[in-house]
Design a protein with these regions (language model features):
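Conserved serine/cysteine hydrolase catalytic core
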Residues: 1-66, 72-73
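Catalytic active-site module of serine/aspartate enzymes centered on a nucleophile-bearing elbow/loop
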Residues: 69-98
């Protein structure tokens, strides 16, 4: 997997950790500042049926609180959608962007 190659680089690991750190700090502050605003553009939400998102969240309902027009579904895969379900992902993207 390409992820293994990239994660051999300490800078990549550092950047990944910084992304998670931001999610529980500055991202929360930004979310709070935007609490009364909704994304006006149509939003496509895709997630893996066999991943954490499916088990722990309600993606369409959750995003409907933050966006005016939400579409999407679980794809027949796990966490790594492009690698696990490329054809299904492409079909969804082409349909959404057409």
């Amino acid at each position: 997997m390409e992820y293994r190659r990239c994660f051999r680089d300490p800078a990549a690991i550092h950047a990944s950790c910084e992304d998670y750190r931001a999610a529980e700090s500055i991202d929360l502050a930004h979310d709070e500042a935007d609490i009364d605003r909704k994304v006006a553009a149509p939003l496509l939400v895709l997630w893996g049926k066999y991943g954490t998102v499916e088990r722990c969240f309600h993606p369409l309902a959750d995003w409907a609180e933050r966006a005016e027009s939400v579409h999407g579904r679980a794809l027949d895969c796990g966490h790594y959608i492009p690698e696990e379900a490329p054809a299904e992902l492409l079909k969804e993207l082409v349909t959404f962007l057409s």
